Structure formats: C-alpha cells, structure tokens
C-alpha cells in the first residue's frame, strides 16, 4: 500500500471588510469537499486560510466606525469563522494576515528578494487625495480602464478584461473616498522585479500547474512582457512597515499570499507532527494546492510563484481556478434579493443543500456556476431526499420490525454489489480531479439502480405474505448496505448527513476503504429522518430577507457619492433667516420655451389664490416643456420680482443637480395642494 500523501491546501483569503456571501462560499465549499475527500482516503491533508486584514479599506472603515483597525478585523474574523463553521467548512486553521508570523515571513521574503537584487527603488508619480490628505491606494481610485475602456474600474486592475495597470494609466480618475479629482505627487516606491522571472514563469505556467484556459490567459500577459510590480504604499496605511523604511508599507497583495504560509506556521506551533520546512522549503516533496477565483489569477500564478522562487521557497503544485457565481442566470443582485449573505442563507436553509448543489454543478474548468433557485429546490429534493435517504427510509423499518434491528448476512444482489464496487475508482478520480459534477452524476446513477432494484423486489408487498420474511430481511439488508456505500461516496459533500447516517448504522466514522466491506449480522439503531425536503416558501423568505439586508444597509450608511465634496455645505444660518423664505407648493399650469433664450422655460404657476409667471433655467433637462404641465413643484414665493428681457419673473422654482441634462425639478409628496406652505 502506498504511503499517505502530504498535502497542504488553501483557499483565497476573504477580505476582513465585509460579510461572506454565497459567491464566496462557492470556493470554500469546493475546497472543503476536496480536502474532506483526501482525508477520507487517509492522506495527511491540511487546510489553512486566514482573513486578509490589511489595506486602506480597512483603515478607512475602522476610522468611519470609530474603532481601531485591530478591533474591526477581530469583529469580522469572528463573523467569518462562524459562517464558515456553520457551512461545515472545516479549516485546520483560520488565521489572520495581521499576525506576527506573517510580519516575520513578509520581512524575510522581502529581505531575501532585496539581497538577491530583485527589488528596485525609484520615485513614482502617484495620486494624492487633496481632500483626504493621503496617497490613494489602487482600490480607492476609480476611472476608465486604459485597455478596454470599461468605466468605473479600480486603479490596479479591470474587472471586465482582467488587465493590470498602474493607477496613473487610469483614464478620468476620481477618488473613491471623497469624490475629489486626485492630484499627482512624487513618492519613493519599492518594486519587485517580476521580469527577472519571465523564463521560469513561462515554463511553470505550462507545466500542468493550471487549467489550460488559465494558462492561455496568462500567456497573453507573458507574451506582452512582464512589468515590475509596485509592492509599497505610503503612510497612512494599515499593514506592515517595510523593514528599514519608515513610512513605507507593504502593499496588501504582497503579504496576503504570504498569509498562507503564516497560517500554516501558526498551526505548526500547535501541531508538533507538522514541520513547516517539510511543506515550504525548496525541494519539498509535499503537495501544495491553492483554490482561487479567476479574478485573482495574476497574483497567484505570476507574482506569487516568482516571489517564492526568488526567496528560496517552493512553488505551488497547482493553482485551481473557478468561475464566478450567478443566481438565476444573472449577476448577483442586491435589489432582486439574489445577493445572498452566508448568514442569511443559514437563517433559512440547511448548509448541505447548497453544498450538494454546488458539487452537482462544479466541473474542472473556470466557467461560471449558476445557482438556479428553482432547479436548486428540485434537484436537492429529488436526489438527496427522493433517492439517497429514500433507500434507508424504505428498508430500516422492516429490519427493526422483523428482525429486532439486526441486518442479516448474505448478498441478495451480487451484480448490484459489484456495480457499486466497480464505480468507486471512477468516483474517486472525479473527486481527485475536482470534477465534482461527474462524481455526483455517477453516485446518483447508483442510487437510481438501488431504488429501482428495491422497487422491483417490493419488500412492502412481500412483508404481507406468509413465508417471505427471510426474503424481506435479505432485500432490506442489501438496501442498507447500498445506502452505506452511497453515504461513503457522498461524505466529502454531506458530512452532517454522513454523521447522522453513521449514528443510524451504528458504526464508527466511515472511511473511503469501508466501501470494500459490508455490514452483516449487524445491529442498527432506530431510524430517524435524515433530511427534509426544501420548502419553496423558505427560499422565497430568504430572498425577501436579502432585500431587507440591502434596505437596512442603505439606512445605516450615507450615500458616499462625493456630492458634498463637489458642492460643500453653506455656512450655518439662524432659524429666523430660514423662516423668512416663503416656500409654497405650486401647480405648473403652463410651460413653454422662451423664444430667443437657450436655457429658459416660462412657467405659469398656480399657488392657490393667484398665478405667478416664473422664468427658470431648466430647458436643457426638459426639452419638451409640455410634459411639465399638471405637475406639482415647489417655489420661493416671496422672492422680489425680477425684470428680465423676456418679462418679469415672480419667484423661483426649486431643483437639484449640477446642470445641463442633470437638473431635477423638485416635487412634493402626493396630496399636497397648490399654495400650501412648505415648512
């Protein structure tokens, strides 16, 4: 028998600035299923992760909430840990990048790279927010992508085309913090000489470490020539200060992947059988796998292996990349209630429903996965309740009633037993290659055969016939053994169901090799329902709750749209000054263009007991003035009449907006009457 494999597995680090949602959970569930399969096979498989806890976003959010960054990341880590645990994601260690292990390793890798000549320093022209008084990190600049012209993209990479670029390459930049137009200032920065590793990366990315589609995408970047990577940020910044460089900090993407190493090192201190160097030293025989989303491929498949190579550590065995999650065929939407937080899901549905559905749809590629909620309900109910659990519920009662819960010896269906045994290697290969969808299809095909065989034998009918009790017991014992096989095959996906089934079967925790054996002359525990059907009403309630989450978040947070920066609040006034302005509801009786005036409309306003003539510069936003007629608006009624070239204007209507087409005439709520005072 071969020696157990030594395997270290990571998932991408969730950012410590927000809640986990179902899109995130796709990756952690996928990774957890693969890890559980390896452990089920008897391999030494260690699964580590951490919160990504550095960067300007965390610093600014903590400032906004009036707490320290350390308090913020501690709060978020507690929330993340709870969500992962309740989704049955079983990390061996869930750490934080804001740790002493990560500080030490980041400093070590940097100094090794520096001493080997892989770090350059030079002055860069960098964006500075004059309103906030700080240099802007890449994620706090937004503008138009210089590669594909997609708007509203971040300052370091484009979410549409995947390109990376310097913030100064971004077109039409704006500060995402204040809305101000940033100004350019010079600053001394530190660069990782990524081009030093061009040849190594061209070979490594084509060595089977990546899916073909990912390697092909990386080839585009490699063929165009790699650029030096800016790894420093200026104070103020929440992160690790670069050794020997006061006021300069490591860019979050430098120390984030080092967080994998730090989390493992933290675990090694508590698990003496684990040796850090055995997994991370150059020439290590252990296997190292990263599971990530396709949006961060460049960091994990270019920068990260180059950093490891240059600092004397081993490179990953493979980087496994998955696509995004869509819901009902579209991008997750807060307004439609399909942007579903992990906790919102858990408040309404069992975690294993989603674990199974993800498994059933996950392949080896990088295609997006669609969570179709109607199909989700149908598939879980049909496969798990209608097929797998149904076998045990059909057979258990007859064994308890007819033989005091003891399974008889013998094999009532040798051909079926052989088919289940023969399927195991293919199912194992599907798990190993992360082709979870194929594994689920093959498992459910076995469940279909088992159910068809039981239905054909119909023990419920035989139980009513004299002299058929031995046959009933043989059929049901066979059914329970087939159910046990299915539980073993599904255990990486459904650990809770497996644990409940093990309790019913009265057996120790099952391993993969247990599929080679049978239960005979074995006492079962009383059967209890192992899984209930999904009620569509619970899915609808989850969607409604997700919409409520959005409304609650909007109620708590200011718009943050930078309007007050562009047009600051005026100086305070006394109440009497405000009270001197007579605001009234007005009905627009007539609205027409003014001949010879480019911007003006002439409005006839009814304010209850009299009519007013008002000229207003809103023509650019209302090219068809007749559409304003019959509409209520608000006006300043005691403004001194003003003589104009086109006539006398007897007041002013109220509108918002910067001008041009963006002028928005204000209206009172329904029920207001012309002439009523606004107060």
Curated annotation (Swiss-Prot):
Keywords: Aminoacyl-tRNA synthetase, ATP-binding, Cytoplasm, Ligase, Metal-binding, Nucleotide-binding, Protein biosynthesis, RNA-binding, tRNA-binding, Zinc. SUPFAM superfamilies: Anticodon-binding domain of a subclass of class I aminoacyl-tRNA synthetases, Methionyl-tRNA synthetase (MetRS), Zn-domain, Nucleic acid-binding proteins, Nucleotidylyl transferase. ATP binds at residue 334. GO terms for molecular function: ATP binding; metal ion binding; methionine-tRNA ligase activity; tRNA binding. Its cofactor is Zn(2+). Its main location: cytoplasm. PANTHER family: METHIONINE--TRNA LIGASE, METHIONINE--TRNA LIGASE, CYTOPLASMIC. This is Methionine--tRNA ligase.
């Amino acid at each position: 028998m071969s020696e157990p494999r030594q395997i270290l597995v990571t998932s991408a680090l969730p950012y410590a600035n927000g809640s986990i949602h179902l899109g995130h959970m796709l990756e952690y569930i996928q990774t957890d299923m693969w890890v559980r399969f390896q452990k089920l096979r008897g391999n030494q498989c260690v699964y580590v992760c951490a919160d990504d806890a550095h960067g300007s976003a965390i610093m600014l959010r903590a400032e906004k909430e009036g707490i320290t960054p350390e308090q913020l990341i501690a709060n978020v880590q507690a929330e993340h840990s709870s969500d992962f645990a309740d989704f049955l994601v079983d990390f061996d260690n869930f750490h934080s990048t804001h740790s002493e292990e990560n500080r030490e390793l980041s400093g070590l890798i940097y100094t090794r790279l520096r001493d080997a000549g892989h770090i350059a320093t030079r002055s860069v022209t960098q964006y500075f927010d004059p309103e906030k008084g700080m240099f802007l990190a890449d994620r706090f600049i937004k503008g138009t992508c210089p590669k594909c012209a997609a708007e509203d993209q971040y300052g370091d990479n484009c979410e549409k085309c995947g390109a990376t670029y310097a913030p100064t390459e971004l077109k039409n930049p704006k500060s995402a913090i204040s809305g101000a137009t940033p100004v350019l200032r010079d600053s001394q920065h530190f660069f990782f000489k990524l081009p030093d590793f061009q040849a190594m990366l061209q070979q490594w990315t084509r060595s089977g470490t990546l899916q073909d589609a990912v390697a092909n995408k990386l080839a585009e970047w490699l063929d165009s020539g790699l650029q030096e990577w800016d790894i420093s940020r200026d104070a103020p910044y929440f992160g690790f200060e670069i050794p020997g460089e006061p006021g300069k900090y490591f860019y979050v993407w430098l120390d984030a992947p080092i967080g994998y190493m730090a989390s493992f090192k933290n675990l090694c201190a508590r698990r003496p059988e684990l040796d850090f160097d055995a997994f991370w030293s150059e020439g290590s025989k252990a296997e190292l796998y990263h599971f990530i989303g396709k949006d961060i491929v460049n960091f994990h498949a270019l920068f990260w292996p180059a950093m490891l190579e240059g600092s004397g550590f081993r490179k990953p065995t493979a980087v496994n990349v998955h696509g995004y999650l869509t819901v009902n065929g579209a991008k997750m939407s807060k307004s439609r209630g399909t942007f579903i937080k992990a906790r919102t899901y858990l408040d309404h549905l069992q975690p294993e429903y989603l674990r199974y559905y993800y498994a059933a749809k996950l392949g080896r590629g990088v295609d997006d996965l669609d969570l179709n909620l109607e199909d989700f309900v149908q598939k879980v109910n049909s496969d798990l309740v209608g097929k797998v659990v149904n076998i045990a519920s059909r057979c258990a009662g007859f064994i308890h009633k007819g033989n005091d819960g003891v399974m008889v010896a013998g094999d009532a269906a040798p051909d079926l037993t052989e088919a289940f045994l023969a399927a195991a290697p293919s199912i194992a290969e599907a798990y190993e290659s992360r082709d979870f969808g194929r594994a689920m299809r093959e498992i459910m095909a076995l469940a279909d055969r088992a159910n068809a065989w039981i239905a054909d034998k119909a023990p419920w009918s035989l139980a009513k016939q004299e002299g058929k009790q031995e046959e009933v017991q043989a059929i049901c014992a066979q059914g329970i053994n087939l159910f046990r096989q299915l539980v073993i095959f599904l255990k990486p996906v459904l650990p809770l169901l497996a644990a409940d089934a093990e309790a019913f079967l009265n057996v120790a925790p099952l391993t993969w090799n247990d599929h080679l054996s049978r239960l005979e002359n074995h006492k079962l525990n009383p059967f209890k329902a192992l899984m209930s059907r999904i009620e569509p009403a619970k899915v609808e309630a989850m969607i409604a709750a997700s919409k409520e989450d959005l409304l609650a978040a909007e109620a708590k947070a200011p718009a943050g749209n930078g309007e007050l920066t562009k047009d600051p609040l005026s100086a305070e006034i006394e109440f009497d000054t405000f009270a001197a302005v007579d605001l009234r509801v007005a009905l627009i009786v007539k609205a027409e263009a003014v001949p010879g005036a480019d911007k003006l409309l002439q409005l006839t306003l009814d304010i209850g007991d009299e009519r007013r003539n008002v000229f207003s510069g809103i023509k650019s936003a209302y090219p068809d003035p007749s559409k304003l007629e019959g509409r209520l608006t608000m006006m300043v009624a005691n403004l001194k009449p003003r003589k104009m070239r086109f006539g006398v204007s007897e007041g002013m209507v109220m509108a918002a907006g910067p001008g041009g087409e963006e002028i928005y005439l204000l209206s009172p709520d329904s029920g207001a009457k012309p002439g009523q005072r606004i107060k």
